[in-house]
Swiss-Prot record:
One function term, GO molecular function aspect: nucleic acid binding
Family membership: Belongs to the eukaryotic/archaeal PrmC-related family.
Gene Ontology cellular component list: cytoplasm; eRF1 methyltransferase complex; large ribosomal subunit; nucleus; ribosome
CDD domains in the record: AdoMet_MTases (cd02440)
Name listed for the protein in its UniProt record: eRF1 methyltransferase catalytic subunit MTQ2
Subunit (UniProt): Heterodimer of MTQ2-TRM112. MTQ2 is the catalytic subunit carrying the catalytic and the S-adenosyl L-methionine binding sites.
Enzyme class: transferase
The keyword Cytoplasm belongs to this UniProt entry's keyword annotation: yes
Purpose of the protein: Methylates eRF1 on 'Gln-182' using S-adenosyl L-methionine as methyl donor. eRF1 needs to be complexed to eRF3 in its GTP-bound form to be efficiently methylated.
Keywords: Cytoplasm, Methyltransferase, Nucleus, S-adenosyl-L-methionine, Transferase
InterPro entries noted in UniProt: DNA_methylase_N6_adenine_CS, Euk-Arch_PrmC-MTase, PrmC-related, SAM-dependent_MTases_sf, Small_mtfrase_dom
Primary residence: cytoplasm
GO biological process: methylation; positive regulation of termination of DNA-templated transcription; regulation of translation; ribosomal large subunit biogenesis
Gene (UniProt): MTQ2
Length: 221
């Protein structure tokens, strides 16, 4: 089992690593050989959208899930506190060999089309009446945290938006790993996506976390 990064953050401002975070880590470890074979001989661009505490991006760098030393890691989050936390977590775990850039942005709005080789997305998946507005002030900590949790109708407003853009985000041989909860109705979502885009979608792992059932799927052309 690969080591889990040490994380020390202000969890009033940044999403605390939980069962969903650890499921993604386990899935990336499970996919290690696949990713090594796919990207082991070339530089890869790896992007985590919604980096939060930075535990996933740091895990990728710390354990060389993408083996090339000079691979580029992008950590995107709309929450400025999350970007600081991601840098702190990488530094705390002595991740010095990989290039890491943090970007404050909404999803892929600051990323060039068809450049991302590996995308990881742990979205705000909790069903809610609506997606919260972006806070007007950096100091509104509770509201920043809500953005990491509340996903609108069926918890899918943000994930649906990303799925519609996936064709523009990934490189031709890229792969995306996206987390869903049972209330997102993932089987229905996957069927619609496959029917529309004719991509390959594979269930990597499902796990019961308290009363919630979480799953991670991979998406490739």
């Amino acid at each position: 089992m690969l080591p889990t990064p040490y994380v020390k953050c202000d969890y009033d401002k940044v999403y605390e690593p939980a069962e969903d975070s650890f499921l993604i880590l386990d899935c990336l470890e499970k996919e290690h050989d696949f990713l090594k074979q796919k990207f082991g001989n070339r530089l890869a661009i790896v992007c985590e959208i919604g980096s939060g505490s930075g535990i996933v991006t740091t895990f990728l760098m710390q354990n060389k899930i993408i083996p090339q030393e000079n691979s580029i890691h992008l950590a995107v989050d709309i929450n400025p506190w999350a970007l600081e936390a991601t840098l702190d977590t990488a530094k705390l775990n002595s991740c010095k060999s990989s290039f890491l850039e943090v970007i404050q942005a909404d999803l892929n709005s600051s990323i060039r089309n068809n450049q991302v080789d590996v995308l990881i997305f742990n979205p705000p998946y909790v069903p809610a009446e609506c997606v919260p507005d972006v806070p007007g002030s950096r100091e509104e900590a509770d509201q920043w945290l809500d953005l990491a949790l509340l996903g609108g109708k069926d918890g899918m407003a943000i994930t649906d938006k990303l799925l519609r853009q996936l064709e523009q985000i990934l490189s031709p041989d890229g792969v995306a790993y996206i987390l869903f909860c049972a209330r997102n109705k993932p089987k229905e979502v996957i069927k619609r996506f496959v029917d529309t885009y004719k991509w390959n979608v594979k269930l990597i792992e499902t796990r019961k976390a308290g009363w919630e059932v979480l799953s991670v799927y991979s998406f490739t052309r």
